[in-house]
Amino acid sequence: MSFAPLQNDTFLRACRRQATDYTPLWLMRQAGRYLPEYKATRARAGSFMGLATNVDYATEVTLQPLERFPLDAAILFSDILTVPDAMGLGLSFAEGEGPRFARVVRDEAAVAELAVPDMEKLRYVFDAVTSIRRALDGRVPLIGFSGSPWTLACYMVEGSGSDDYRLVKTLMYSRPDLMHRILAINADAVAAYLNAQIDAGAQAVMVFDSWGGVLADGAFQEFSLAYTTRVLAQLKRTGVDGTDVPRIVFTKGGALWLEDMKGLDCEVLGLDWTANLARARALVGGAVGGPGKALQGNIDPNVLFAPPEAIAAQARAVLDRFGAPHTDRGTTGPTHIFNLGHGISQHTPPEHVAALVEAVHGHSRAMRAAAGTGRA
């Protein structure tokens, strides 16, 4: 399998803690309902799953934000719940209600039926990865992704989204043995799923631990972090084109546990808007020439409802909090990938996204010029 040479490797360089000409930027849920063209494609598809399971539609919507904005990476259009759906739990999306499973996993009998699914059931995802990679034609890298074992378990036990996670936490505290069995199966399934995306052409992969932050200290390490670690240990390090595949881990609400996550076998840690970027850089970013993690994030998505000049000011503030960029191309050092602290809201005005992208690219170039690189 061969693909066009990569023209913009800024995102991948930042993942590897290599110096870049500017701070790369992409957005969680960048292909989504805030774009009118997405809504038009979604209407043609007839349903969310009709969109996600159709290779042509998934390719089309993945590329839509790149046609509008000079983003530095594309991310596969899919859903984190495709894996438990392939386990036979019956995923559906009711209009205005979000995802729902027809079958839930709350007792020993249900857990006994769980197994790592046949990846052929997810062939539509891998075919979409290859299709998107070809359609990108080397423009920017493609990110594959999955939900974390814990986050998938939340939906599998609750049956849908939750405000208090009462059912999954009840199982966790009353039958930790069952929860560990669910999480072990999930971890092995997620690893197989991400490896298949890598084989299909993904150039980086991301684990979304969207609900890790709802756990108590101690429970996070036991029920979330340990199983993210199990996923990472199984991931392929090299993509189909022979280059390394950076691994990104994002735990929403995880700033409390940065020192724990420092030990994860991944290249990038994603941060939500509650994290202090300067503190995160000091804790896990590493020094020039030494080991460390690249950092991704972390502007509040609701900033995008402010006027463009306020958006630009907030973007500059995030960049300034990370601090002076690493500029020595002869070695590695602290790097920053600009992103939101969580997914973009469906109500976001697209022109406000344009203002954000312009501000990030412009200010980050100016920061490097001020640092004396002469490459602004």
Swiss-Prot record:
Alphabetized InterPro entries for the sequence: UROD/MetE-like_sf, Uroporphyrinogen_deCO2ase_HemE, Uroporphyrinogen_deCOase
Reactions this protein catalyses: uroporphyrinogen III + 4 H(+) = coproporphyrinogen III + 4 CO2
Catalytic EC class: lyase
Cellular localization per UniProt: Cytoplasm
Listed Gene3D superfamilies: 3.20.20.210
Keywords, in A-Z order: Cytoplasm, Decarboxylase, Lyase, Porphyrin biosynthesis
Top-level taxon in the UniProt lineage: Bacteria
A matching Pfam family: URO-D
Residues annotated for substrate binding in this entry: R29, Q30, A31, G32, R33, D79, Y155, S210, H342
EC number per UniProt: 4.1.1.37
CDD domains named among the record's database cross-references: URO-D
GO biological process: protoporphyrinogen IX biosynthetic process from glutamate
Keyword Glycoprotein in record: no
A single GO cellular-component term on record: cytosol
GO molecular function: uroporphyrinogen decarboxylase activity
Positions of the record's site feature: Transition state stabilizer: D79
Primary location: cytoplasm
Pathway: Porphyrin-containing compound metabolism; protoporphyrin-IX biosynthesis; coproporphyrinogen-III from 5-aminolevulinate: step 4/4
Keyword Cytoplasm: yes
Family: Belongs to the uroporphyrinogen decarboxylase family.
Function: Catalyzes the decarboxylation of four acetate groups of uroporphyrinogen-III to yield coproporphyrinogen-III.
Subunit-structure text: Homodimer.
Name recorded for this polypeptide: Uroporphyrinogen decarboxylase
Organism: Paracidovorax citrulli (strain AAC00-1) (Acidovorax citrulli)
Gene name for this UniProt entry: hemE
